[in-house]
Regions:
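A short loop-to-beta-strand scaffold at the N-terminal edge of the catalytic core in hydrolase folds
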Residues: 22-32
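Conserved HGGG/HGGXW glycine-rich cap/lid loop of the alpha/beta-hydrolase fold
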Residues: 30-82
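Active-site loop/oxyanion-hole signature of alpha/beta-hydrolase fold enzymes
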Residues: 68, 72-112, 153, 292
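Short beta-to-alpha linker loops that shape the active-site pocket of alpha/beta-hydrolase fold enzymes
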Residues: 71-75, 141, 278-279
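Conserved hydrolase catalytic core segment
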Residues: 107-150
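Flexible "cap/lid" loop of the alpha/beta hydrolase fold
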Residues: 133-174
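Conserved serine/cysteine hydrolase catalytic core
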Residues: 198, 207-265
Length: 304
């Protein structure tokens, strides 16, 4: 591809709609880089966000690599079901990503993600080991082994539904007159504290959709965001034990999401690095660190 084409790909990702018939719908995919080469990297976003939120992180890599970033179920332009009845864990997100991997032609890819997207990537990697040659997980949501076991007990299964994350998500304002109003409401506050303006605007670009009653509304509804916080009957520890590819976890220094120690016993494929001065939102606040880890895995010999 000519250099001018690469520049356009970096600044303006192509937008694809990927039908997933085995999953009952479709996902929207941002496609960066040279389409003449196979997909190198698949990146999954965190709960409540969307693929475009990570443009600042991913776009510079598109000069050398072909990148897919899907909107997960219930986010962005995905059309997969968001029914919450009888939902118990993130197995749906993992299976959706496995279906995305099935749709990719070519050699195995590096699979990466942030927060819930990282955990979903982990679950997908053990379902499709032949399609993944490496994992990079930015502060994935992985509770302690004891907590994960507790979440599988019927008596404690609904405990997360009373957590502040769930309560606050359900209270979240979901409608705005326009994107400028949403920007003013979010800028410098809550989870968005410290975010560069460009990253916040990228989030809002795909994070808001037309409201039938006028104005804009959140693409990821408060109910779906809360459901993701409330269901944890999946087992990332079992998945890590089953991994057949090298895995690099970037753990936030000031974070409560990832409880994998730096030297996890019995997990020889997993390397954990605590990022100094980082929070759970390190892909937004320290993109160069995450980008470096992605590039290192992409450039590594195939070790899967």
């Amino acid at each position: 591809m000519p250099r001018s084409g690469l520049n356009r790909a970096v600044n303006e990702p192509r937008r694809l709609t990927l039908d997933l018939p085995t999953r009952g719908g479709a996902v929207a995919v941002l496609d960066w880089g040279d389409q003449a080469r196979p997909v190198d990297l698949v990146f999954a976003h965190a709960n409540g966000f969307n693929a475009l939120t990570y443009r600042t992180l991913l776009a510079p890599l598109a000069e050398r690599f072909h990148i897919w970033a899907p909107d997960l179920r219930g986010h962005g332009a995905a059309t997969l079901s968001t029914a919450t009845e009888a939902r118990r864990g993130w197995g749906d997100h993992g299976a959706d990503l496995a279906a995305v991997l099935d749709a990719i032609k070519g050699p195995p890819v590096v699979l990466a993600g942030h927060s819930m997207g990282g955990t979903a990537g982990l679950l997908a990697a053990v379902q499709r080991p032949e399609r993944v040659r490496g994992l990079v997980l930015a502060d994935p949501v992985i509770w302690s082994r004891t907590t994960v076991l507790a979440f599988h007990l019927p008596i404690l299964r609904d405990l997360p539904r009373r957590s502040p994350l769930v309560v606050n998500a359900l209270k979240r304002r979901s409608r705005f007159d326009d994107r400028d109003a949403a920007f003013a409401a979010y800028h410098g506050r809550g989870a968005f504290k410290g975010w560069p303006d460009a990253v916040l605007r990228d989030y809002l670009s795909d994070g808001l959709v037309p409201d039938p009653d006028g104005g804009l509304m959140l693409a990821c509804t408060p109910q779906w965001e809360a459901s993701n916080y409330a269901v944890h009957a999946h087992d990332p520890w079992r998945a890590m034990k089953a991994l057949s590819c090298p895995t690099h976890i970037l753990k936030a220094e000031a974070g409560l999401a990832c409880h994998v120690p730096e030297r996890p016993f019995g997990l020889p494929r997993v390397m954990v690095e605590t990022v100094p001065d980082s929070t759970h939102f390190l892909p937004m606040l320290q993109p160069e660190v995450v980008r470096g880890a992605l590039a290192a895995m992409l450039e590594a010999p195939d070790a899967a």
